[in-house]
């Protein structure tokens, strides 16, 4: 893009003055680069009192954690901004507000969420937000229903599928979720103590067959405009509040992928808790995670079905019973994608603090083995895990 340049802190301040929608833009005087992700520069823009007022986020033309040897499209910044704008239109309460974006500079200005915390960090600390799972379920139901065939016309949706074609970011997901963990790949990272389990997964014919189906559905089922990366590190929480951020992986894909990714991150925390806390606190935290899993699915399903019954525009899809039949397939997909998230976060490229921050090496490896075992069980048995209580029973059975 001819006008692209990488922002300095001073550039970010000036940009925020122009597009931050503040009554006194000259009050913005400094910027802190806070990006700890893999893909972007993120600046907190502060006023004269040191208070953060807005966020400026710019995509880099490469994967930050790898370097310029892994180039990456800047169009992801447009896709992220437009995904958040669409999601925010249907669920403003739980979507970060985009104040401005520029496709050529691959930059956007967002509301500041300094009064919120990253959900994963809070879960790892043992901080419980009892409303968060239900709020995330509401976000998923609203955004996924309103961008699906139930609500959009066929012509609208076909145009949107093209507009949100995101092949480079999707390939990252395709590789990291469904290919790398099951082969000997240089991107994989895992404790040598896990090598026996890793080799078992690579040689597990039933697992590989089920993963092939998950990948094929990811490639071919353009059901709704997904967030595409809705893990607990892409969600901000505060008391009674929740906001989804970081939607650069947005594309039209299988609804169960977003739901399964969200469930999988709750279960990654479930698997890690015995290594993060003593027995009593870990047991209590695990019960909270299971309650979160239950609420996330049940509230999502209830809200999605209610929207189907009230707002479906496509007459053929409004036939009694079809929405329920469709949702059952979403559930089966979600269970499988949940399992793939557990495995790829344990032995693939991108790990999570829920497991990696466990200080005792032996306990960490044991928690990681549990995550791998649960992930395999969910992927292979997804068609037989027909409802939420069966899922919870399978989780408890895994230990």
Curated annotation (Swiss-Prot):
The keyword Repeat does not apply. It catalyses: 5-(methylsulfanyl)-D-ribose + ATP = 5-(methylsulfanyl)-alpha-D-ribose 1-phosphate + ADP + H(+). The keyword Transport does not apply. One of its GO terms (biological process) is L-methionine salvage from methylthioadenosine. Its EC number is 2.7.1.100. Pfam families: APH. Substrate binds at residues 229, 344. It is an enzyme of class 2 (transferase). ATP binds at residues 40, 57, 111-113, 246-248. One of its GO terms (molecular function) is S-methyl-5-thioribose kinase activity. Pathway: Amino-acid biosynthesis; L-methionine biosynthesis via salvage pathway; S-methyl-5-thio-alpha-D-ribose 1-phosphate from S-methyl-5'-thioadenosine (hydrolase route): step 2/2. Keywords: Amino-acid biosynthesis, ATP-binding, Kinase, Methionine biosynthesis, Nucleotide-binding, Transferase. PANTHER family: METHYLTHIORIBOSE KINASE (PTHR34273:SF2). Homodimer. Catalyzes the phosphorylation of methylthioribose into methylthioribose-1-phosphate. Belongs to the methylthioribose kinase family. This is Methylthioribose kinase. The gene is mtnK.
